[in-house]
Amino acid sequence: MKKIRVSLLTKVVIAIAAGVLFGQFLPGGIARIFVTFNSLFGNFLSFSIPLIILGLVTPAIGDLGKGAGKLLLITALIAYGSTVFSGFFTFLSGSAIFPHILPTNTELTAMENPEDFMLTPYFVVNMPPLMDVMTALLLSFTIGLGLSNISGTTLRDSFTDFKEIIIKLIEVVIIPLLPLHIFGIFLNMTVSGQVMSIITMFLKVIIVIFVLHVLLLLIQFTIAGAIAGKNPLRLLKNMLPAYATALGTQSSAATIPVTLAQAVKNGVRENIAIFTVPLCATIHLAGSTMKIVACAMAIMIMAGEPVTFSNFSGFIMMLGITMVAAPGVPGGAIMAALGILQSMLGFNETLQALMIALYIAMDSFGTACNVTGDGAIAVVVDKIAGKN
């Protein structure tokens, strides 16, 4: 009998719906069992975040410098610039839109101290992390930059193995348990009587982000078309098969063959496309950055927290670097970003869970935005490379 595979998005949607449904009638004593699980999982997530940063960011920076040539540097800078532009474009757009469509100072404010208004766990197990998030980031940058400038491979190989362990941790432990964690969050919010405001926020934010990601693609291909002297709409149209494929796979890596073929169809030389597309599938996550920035802004506005350029500018710049390290699994980008959400924007476990749920709800077209934008970068790199 063929095993039926259920996507992470489907599991999250079911978890949200089940949490709202069961929260209507489930006795408090039984609900607290799931609250206890949430407490344990949240603490384990806090313990894991510095390890995730160290395991993903360090080898990503080290590998980026391995055999670094001029074209690699140019492609990486363009990808980073596109990702950061996406973040600031989203921030400016969200600042103009979200305050008018989202309620402020709602009960979400109480999530700064959830136990004041929600069910409490039966017991708590403290799981202190080995280091704080900023220490993990600084250590990752220091070791990663060092690895990219030495010829030895022993330490690089060790961090490559550690990266595999972290990816297994994400794929085998964290991602499978996320739906249950999200179920517990929405169950608890339903019991506390605030779930409808969250669901309404989700729908509004999803619509806004969908419109913004279409505008972002138009901007990316307008710039690429202007640089290469080609029709931007035709370039974008040729990339639509890659967009459609990514909607189904939810993976930039799995979409590489289609992205590659469509980039060549746009006139990119095959050797340039073979170099650019797989690299950008790893380091260019403009769509994911857009979702993370927009979701973070929406949640902070709902919580009555100040959303200012000063606290988001550094976050966006750091997010652009962090996205380089995001593993190519559904939900991988938001897992890589949890550390800076916690350290730079002050998100606690409950707000992080809301971020994960809201992010995964839009995972398909975020990935589609990423891979379609890769086609624009390939056109630009092909033009810069010239005849060489």
Go through each PLM region and give its residues:
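Signature of multi-pass transmembrane helix bundles
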Residues: 2-26, 39-48, 70-234
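Juxtamembrane helix-boundary/capping and inter-helix hinge elements in multi-pass membrane proteins
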Residues: 27, 60-70, 148-153, 161, ...
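Short amphipathic alpha-helical coupling elements at transmembrane boundaries
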Residues: 32-46, 157-172, 237-245, 261-265, ...
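Membrane-water interface of transmembrane alpha-helices in multipass transporters/channels
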Residues: 33, 69, 73, 195-203, ...
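Transmembrane helix-bundle signature of multi-pass membrane transporters/permeases
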Residues: 40, 44, 57-58, 75-80, ...
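Membrane-interface alpha-helices at helix entry/exit sites of multi-pass transporters
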Residues: 69-75, 168, 172-175, 265-281, ...
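Alpha-helical membrane segments and immediately flanking helix-loop junctions
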Residues: 111-112, 236-293, 320-334, 361-380
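Transmembrane alpha-helical segments and their short flanking loops
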Residues: 293-388
